[in-house]
């Protein structure tokens, strides 16, 4: 979300996921703050001592009725297409985070790329959480998704592809723990792209968001193959299951 972009400058980006950024938005921007239970005004609440720092709660209860806020302040059902896209992007970042732990344990140099991608996914969430139909120029100033990350992914893809043997058959998710984890990330990325495409077609988000996810799935596929090669693990090849061939051998 946009506040994640702001949060990265405040040191929040590395500690908050996409959901956490929604919470940070409520703290950083007054329009997101709830008035609390019906009939209770802020002035009626017990005030903390001036000597005790106020620790914000992670839960706000504002979403208990099945609605949540976009960055623009618009309230939408939690199963809205916008939140489906944001949530799947968050899931993708979590999957990459798991793969990154495995990558770091092995000391692979592409760990930095994966971490950078996680940060970029925060920006993707920013753009998605700012629907164009309700966004003002002030919102878009923080959340417009540029083409730079797409070009960077293409450079990384070309770098690894040049070191890999050409594909001569369909491969299955395999090649060791890291390779398999990256294939899982690729599958989640494809789902995130499918959630984003309708928003692009409706004019709710920039086409660069869908382009980035499309390129990211290619990167994750290439990186999975590269990881298998670097670790000396064999990739499993797809072989058609032909029952007739088995019966002929009887």
Swiss-Prot record:
Subcellular location(s) per record: Mitochondrion
Tissue specificity statement from the Swiss-Prot or TrEMBL entry: Expressed in liver and skeletal muscle.
InterPro entries hit by this protein: CblAdoTrfase-like, CblAdoTrfase-like_sf, PduO-typ
Amino acids binding ATP: 60-63, 68-69, 78, 190-194, 214
Phosphoserine found at: 134
Gene Ontology MF terms: ATP binding; cobalamin binding; corrinoid adenosyltransferase activity; transferase activity, transferring alkyl or aryl (other than methyl) groups
GO BP, sorted A to Z: cobalamin metabolic process
A GO CC term assigned to this protein in UniProt: mitochondrial matrix
Modified residues (N6-succinyllysine): 211, 230
Chain positions with N6-acetyllysine modification: 230
Catalytic activity: cob(I)alamin-[corrinoid adenosyltransferase] + ATP = apo-[corrinoid adenosyltransferase] + adenosylcob(III)alamin + triphosphate
Similarity section: Belongs to the Cob(I)alamin adenosyltransferase family.
Known role: Converts cob(I)alamin to adenosylcobalamin (adenosylcob(III)alamin), a coenzyme for methylmalonyl-CoA mutase, therefore participates in the final step of the vitamin B12 conversion. Generates adenosylcobalamin (AdoCbl) and directly delivers the cofactor to MUT in a transfer that is stimulated by ATP-binding to MMAB and gated by MMAA.
Subunit: Homotrimer.
Disease tied to this protein: Methylmalonic aciduria, cblB type: An autosomal recessive disorder of methylmalonate and cobalamin metabolism due to defective synthesis of adenosylcobalamin.
Stated name of the protein: Corrinoid adenosyltransferase MMAB
Lineage: Eukaryota, Metazoa, Chordata, Craniata, Vertebrata
């Amino acid at each position: 979300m946009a506040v994640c972009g702001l949060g990265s400058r405040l040191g929040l980006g590395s500690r908050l996921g996409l959901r956490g950024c929604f919470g940070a938005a409520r703290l950083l921007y007054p329009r997101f703050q709830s008035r609390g239970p019906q009939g209770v005004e802020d002035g009626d609440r017990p005030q903390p001592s001036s000597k005790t720092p106020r620790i914000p709660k992670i839960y706000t209860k504002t979403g208990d009725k099945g609605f949540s806020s976009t960055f623009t302040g618009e309230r939408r059902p939690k199963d809205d297409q916008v939140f489906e896209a944001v949530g799947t992007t968050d899931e993708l970042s979590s999957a990459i985070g798991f793969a990154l732990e495995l990558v770091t344990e092995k000391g692979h140099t592409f760990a930095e790329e994966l971490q950078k991608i996680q940060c970029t996914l925060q920006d993707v969430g920013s753009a998605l959480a700012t629907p164009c139909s309700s966004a003002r120029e002030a919102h878009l100033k923080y959340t417009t998704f540029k083409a730079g990350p797409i070009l960077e992914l293409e450079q990384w893809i070309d770098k690894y592809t040049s070191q890999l043997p050409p594909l001569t058959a369909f491969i299955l998710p395999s090649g060791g723990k890291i390779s398999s984890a990256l294939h899982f990330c690729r599958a989640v990325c494809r789902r995130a792209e499918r959630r984003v495409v309708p928003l692009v077609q409706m004019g709710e988000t920039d086409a660069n968001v869908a382009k980035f996810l499309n390129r990211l799935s290619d990167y994750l596929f290439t990186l999975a193959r590269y990881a298998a090669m670097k670790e000396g693990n064999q990739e499993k090849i797809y072989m058609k299951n032909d029952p007739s061939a088995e019966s002929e051998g009887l």
